[in-house]
Amino acid sequence: DGNESCKNRFECQFTSRFNRTMTAFIRFETGDKVDYANDRLGDETALHLQYDVRLWRRLFLWLEGSLERLTIPEGTVYDARVYYFRALYHFTNALYVRGIVQLYDVERDPSLYQDEVMGNERSIGTQLLLTYKLNPFTLAYLGYSDFGIEDDLTDPVTLNRTLFVKVSYAFRP
């Protein structure tokens, strides 16, 4: 219905590398955005923040956060937030551990949707991975991951839980 393109849009971003160990990134966006779920044009405001830091020689941390709001004249269609944290620690050149936590949280106004939607929805995922380099071509992994949700109809529940061991070899011709 003619809602395929955005007409007015403003975006501003800033990146700074404070020193060899810290980087920050900020992006702000506002303007028209297509609401594909309801085939209409809305107004979006979004903010994305990212901060990376290396502590000492072996610890790396990544923090990210994104906020997004879509509005129409009748009200706020949704507020969405995504948070991401990753940590990496090198015990030695051959052994390291990585952990990730990601949280997704959205609040919708169901009365502003054509189809039935949940008003509140939240999910969280975690991963933990231990990696050991046996030689330049062979890696061994021990990992754990899980994923959980919570919404208007369910209490917090873990859906997927995985524990795995893997050996990877890079064949050379």
Task: Identify the role of each PLM range.
Residues 1-173:
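Exposed, low-structure sequence patches enriched in small/polar residues
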